[in-house]
Amino acid sequence: MTRPVRTRFAPSPTGFIHLGNIRSALYPWAFARKMKGTFVLRIEDTDVERSSQEAVDAILEGMQWLGLDFDEGPIYQMQRMDRYREVLAQMLEKGLAYPCYMSAEELDALRERQREAGLKPRYDGTWRPEPGKVLPEPPAGVKPVLRFRNPLTGTVVWDDAVKGRVEISNEELDDLVIARPDGTPIYNFCVVVDDMDMGITHVIRGDDHVNNTPRQINILNALGGEPPVYAHLPTVLNEQGEKMSKRHGAMSVMAYRDAGFLPEAVVNYLARLGWSHGDAEIFSREQFVEWFDLEHLGKSPAQYDHSKLSWLNAHYIKEADNARLAELAKPFLDALGIDDAAIATGPALDAVVGLMKDRATTVKEIAEGAAMFYRVPAPDADALAQHVTDAVRPALADLAAALKAADWTKEAVSAALKATLATHKLKMPQLAMSVRLLVAGTTHTPSIDAVLVLFGRDVVVTRIEAALA
């Protein structure tokens, strides 16, 4: 009988979480949703010195923003210490683990001798009990580590969903330390107990964990557990071809929100960063879940491309509801000194966003473009001298008069502009640039007729006439 699918995301809360990290949450989340399974969030916080609540909060916030909801958790390893100690005691009792009194200095010296002899550095089993073997006398006052009694012969084999069949000889593995002298369990041991207790069927994680896998499988087999399906994802590289990391300039997940990216764009981009469905580039979350499978995970490192993410974000911004974008733009407007009170004095923000979004790649850019509608214009003096010339001023006066009488629609404003151009024998840039400067304070705006309609008749006419007075 096939076990119900149970996947997990098991981050260590030791600081920074970037797109490469969160991809290891996206894929198991998608697989669990596709298979109508369970997605578990486990916080691997046994590294007490480096773990922090701030880092946990960053993980939770990033997952929530991207819509990666979990069915169980967060489960904290530090809250499961009694369970780990229980399993350690059982392993000691069954001879699956043993105390080792070799000091760190002795182990270093052993490894140095092995290196000098051209051998692979490894623990030599000095304290491993064997039939007929006489063990050294335990040194007084020394607390031992606990080591797992790894098989001496045979091969660890698993069919990795990404890497294919992997075989590691047990002769390559030494007896892994599974508990420190103070009794606290080691990462590789905790992971096995957790995966076994939580019934994890599929482990989808970065390939930096490949070397841990044979050790974890051996411990799992010793405990009578059933190994999950493993899928080790190739590394995510930054734009310079280095492994993505904070040290190499990676942005945190929430920094993308703060830069004005939409979560659906980031999810779409992340989905393609190591998985594919034919040539499909743009797809919804629902399509991604429907299409996702382990067979189409990439086998080569994926390289981050910021311009591709920006292109996707621009697409999703164009598709997004104006009211939603308006709410998302407010914090960016506030950072520009434009609060709700200022917004209330200008045109409807939904309408402004609707005009600006076709030119934007981020919500931040929408806000920067929208700001002109809620500020008193302060055009550059040199720009005024360049565009509001004596040749243009009569046309501006006539345009103001025409706009006073025109219907306030885009079509009517466009007709007034064209009629003024014809009367004064000007080209559109000559008139449009000066109008943009006087009304909006900048020469960079969308279509002039659409911009003027949003500013409103009174504002447009008043600002043009004030400049001519």
From Swiss-Prot:
Localization in the cell: Cytoplasm
Sections of the chain in a coiled coil: none
Motif 'HIGH' region, chain ranges: 11-21
GO cellular component: cytosol
Catalysed reaction, written as an equation: tRNA(Glu) + L-glutamate + ATP = L-glutamyl-tRNA(Glu) + AMP + diphosphate
InterPro entries, sorted: aa-tRNA-synth_I_cd-bd, aa-tRNA-synth_I_codon-bd_sub2, aa-tRNA-synth_I_CS, aa_tRNA-synth_I_cd-bd_sf, Glu-tRNA-ligase_bac/mito, Glu-tRNA-synth_I_codon-bd_sub1, Glu/Gln-tRNA-synth, Glu/Gln-tRNA-synth_Ib_cat-dom
Entry keyword set: Aminoacyl-tRNA synthetase, ATP-binding, Cytoplasm, Ligase, Nucleotide-binding, Protein biosynthesis
Matches recorded under Pfam families: Anticodon_2, tRNA-synt_1c
Regions that span the bilayer: none
Superkingdom field: Bacteria
Motif 'KMSKS' region, residue numbers: 243-247
One BP annotation, GO: glutamyl-tRNA aminoacylation
Presence of the UniProt keyword Transcription in the record: no
Molecular function terms, GO-annotated: ATP binding; glutamate-tRNA ligase activity; tRNA binding; zinc ion binding
Enzyme class name: ligase
Keyword Acyltransferase: no
Positions bound to ATP: K246
Enzyme Commission (EC) number: 6.1.1.17
Quaternary structure (record): Monomer.
Family matches, as HAMAP family: Glu_tRNA_synth_type1
Family: Belongs to the class-I aminoacyl-tRNA synthetase family. Glutamate--tRNA ligase type 1 subfamily.
Function: Catalyzes the attachment of glutamate to tRNA(Glu) in a two-step reaction: glutamate is first activated by ATP to form Glu-AMP and then transferred to the acceptor end of tRNA(Glu).
NCBIfam families found in the cross-reference section: gltX_bact (TIGR00464)
Entry protein name: Glutamate--tRNA ligase
